[in-house]
Structures are given as C-alpha cells and as structure tokens.
Amino acid sequence: RDASGRYTVTSAGLAVPRQNGKNVCLEGREFFGMVINGEKILHTAHQVRTAKKSFNRLARMFTDKRHPEVLELVKNIRYTNGEECIELLNGGSIEFSARSRQAARGFDGISLVVYDEAQELTDDQVEAIMATLAASATGTRQLIYTGTPPYPGCPGDVFRRRRTACLDAPGAHDAWHEWSVEG
C-alpha cells in the first residue's frame, strides 16, 4: 500500500502448475490482509468444493489452539454450506463463494477479490463480481488471479488475457508471477 492506504498493485496474477504452493501464497496474503489490514476479502473458486477446501484450510489457522493469540482475533466463523465466512474483531473478514452470475451479490465493502482457479474464470463471472465492487465504498481494491496454466479447451479466457496483458505491456499497478520446470 502507498502512504494514502491505496494498493500499489491493483491486479496481480500467479500461474503455477498443480502442487507448487499457490494455496500457501493465497493463505498468507489472506491471513495478512484480514489480521493486519482489517480487509474484507471475497475468495472465489470455480467449484463449491474448491472454495470449501480453501475455507477449511484458512479456518484451521484461526482455530488452532496452539496459537491462542490468533484465536483471540476471531469474532465468528460460519461453516454453513455456501455461506462460509471468517470474521475478525478488527473488522477483517473473508467470504468464500463458488463463481456464478449471482455469486457476488450481497457482499459489501470488499477490497480484495481472489479468483482461485482463474484458468476457469469467464467474462460473465468477472462482470458479476465487478458490479459488486463498483458498489463498494472502500475506494481501493485489489484483484488476485491464481491458477494453473490453462489446458486446451479451457473455458476461461480471462486468465490467459490477463497474463498476456501483464507480460506484454504491464501497467504501473500490475504484477504477474509464474514458475515451472524449465523446458
């Protein structure tokens, strides 16, 4: 963030093959955002089970009895299917949702959107989420796209276009990261 509290990187991408640390990177960013910055985060995935898996991993961090200092930060953890959410006493929160045309409705004050499995992300899904962000009063936002390299016939052109834009002509507020085996 800059001196005024705005994100210096507003669009970031991470493309790595499976089992290469993508979720650990996301969990670190989400944990930091909630605990330190009090951010309201929307974590989206292409399937319910993927969103649920990410929720369960992050929820374990906030319920681990070996870390009472983290337990003390928690206001509420909602485990209801389709309404998974972690809320902190400092106002930070994260909600998990499978993507659809209506998936982002009802989320207020979101400053960070995580598009997990973004190789499956479609223009319609982005449009639905961006409409929610446009109504947000935070004044600042960050979008993070994470996924594996798209396979042939993959429905999500958004991730591919985002990567191309960041590598060919990166904007001042763009970041793109990827790693894989050479060759």
Give, region by region, the residue ranges found by the protein language model.
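Phosphate/NTP-binding elements of NTP-utilizing enzymes
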Residues: R1-G183
